């Protein structure tokens, strides 16, 4: 039998994995996997588990949200020739699952995909020095939604928690002067949102069209949302973001391998839905397909 390392975040998604956990384990066993469980107890546990033990297994998988998957990938980036990654998404919004078409909050269905799926090359983002992101690094409007929403509210309200928190932020959108240097050019101006991503979705609010994103092409999508300048124009800008109208004058989508952001003051970032700290300057890059994701 193949050896499967399964890292479980017991607090993700209101603990919903418990309801069909036995059936999911049977699905994996019937598919030829002998599973060893690792339960996280705090931040970065998944990273350390993956770094320390993944090389001993044929496949590494995790049960949790995008943050758990991000931690696992961060650990695998520290070892040579990492095994392929399976994902049982049990988070609140599950942006990665939305991008790759995995069943969400369905332990049996996702376990079946680990058995029947194919490993696909998956780009990983570099976040400053020695830190990584699986699918997005972002700042500005809406980016605080994921890590600013209280955990108890996430568990109790699910996706609605993000919508409520996002609605609160509409009244306090801040314009941020920034210089952005990327592969083919430079942007200088005021932004209300910026990101570098390998995903079609962030917090279920900002979305890119499926045909714009390829997960293993060595390119990331740089999204820059400019300050409209007037109160009346904010409605047009918000509509462009929410309806994915990328021909809007306020919205730029640029493919790049590298981006450097320079602000006039420290600015808060989110890294895969978690607090990424504040940075006055930050360099992001695309690592071309260092891991493989099963779907």
Model-identified regions with their sequence ranges:
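A generic structural signal for short beta-strands and their flanking turns/coil linkers
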Residues: 174-176, 190-192, 216-221, 255-259
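Gly/Ser/Thr-rich active-site loops/lids in small-molecule metabolic enzymes
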Residues: 153-160, 201, 205-232
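ATP/nucleoside-binding phosphotransfer catalytic cores, i.e., glycine-rich phosphate-binding loops
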Residues: 182, 214, 224-295
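Glycine-rich phosphate/pyrophosphate-binding beta-alpha loops
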Residues: 138, 142, 195-211, 275
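Short Gly/Thr/Asp-enriched flexible loops that form oxyanion-binding sites at enzyme active sites
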Residues: 68-80
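ATP/NTP phosphate-donor binding region
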Residues: 1-63
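Catalytic core of DAGKc-family lipid kinases
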Residues: 31, 40, 78-196
């Amino acid at each position: 039998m193949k050896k499967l390392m399964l890292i479980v975040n017991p607090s993700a998604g209101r603990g919903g994995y418990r309801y069909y956990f036995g059936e999911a384990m049977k699905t994996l066993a019937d598919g030829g996997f002998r599973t060893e469980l690792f339960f996280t107890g705090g931040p970065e546990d998944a990273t350390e588990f993956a770094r320390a033990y993944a090389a001993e297994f044929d496949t590494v998988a995790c049960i949790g949200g995008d943050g758990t998957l991000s931690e696992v990938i961060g650990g695998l980036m520290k070892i040579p020739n990492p095994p392929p990654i399976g994902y049982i998404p049990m988070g609140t919004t599950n942006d990665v699952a939305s991008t790759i078409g995995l069943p969400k909050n369905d332990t049996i269905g996702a376990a079946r995909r680990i058995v029947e799926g194919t490993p696909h090359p998956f780009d990983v983002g570099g976040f400053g020095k020695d830190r990584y992101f699986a699918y997005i690094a972002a700042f500005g409007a809406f980016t605080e939604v994921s890590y600013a929403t209280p955990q108890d509210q996430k568990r109790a309200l699910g996706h609605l928690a993000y919508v409520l928190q996002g609605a609160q932020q509409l009244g306090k959108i801040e314009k941020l002067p920034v210089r952005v240097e990327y592969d083919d050019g430079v942007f200088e101006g005021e932004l209300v949102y910026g990101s570098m991503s390998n995903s079609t979705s962030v917090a279920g609010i900002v979305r890119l069209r499926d045909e714009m994103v390829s997960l293993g092409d060595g390119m990331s999508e740089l999204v820059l949302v400019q300050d409209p300048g007037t109160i009346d124009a904010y409605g047009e800008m918000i509509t462009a973001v929410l309806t994915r109208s990328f021909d809007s004058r306020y919205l730029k989508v640029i493919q790049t391998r590298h981006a450097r952001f320079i602000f006039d003051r420290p600015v808060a970032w989110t890294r895969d839905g978690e607090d990424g700290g504040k940075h006055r300057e930050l360099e992001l890059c695309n690592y071309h397909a260092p891991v493989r994701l099963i779907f």
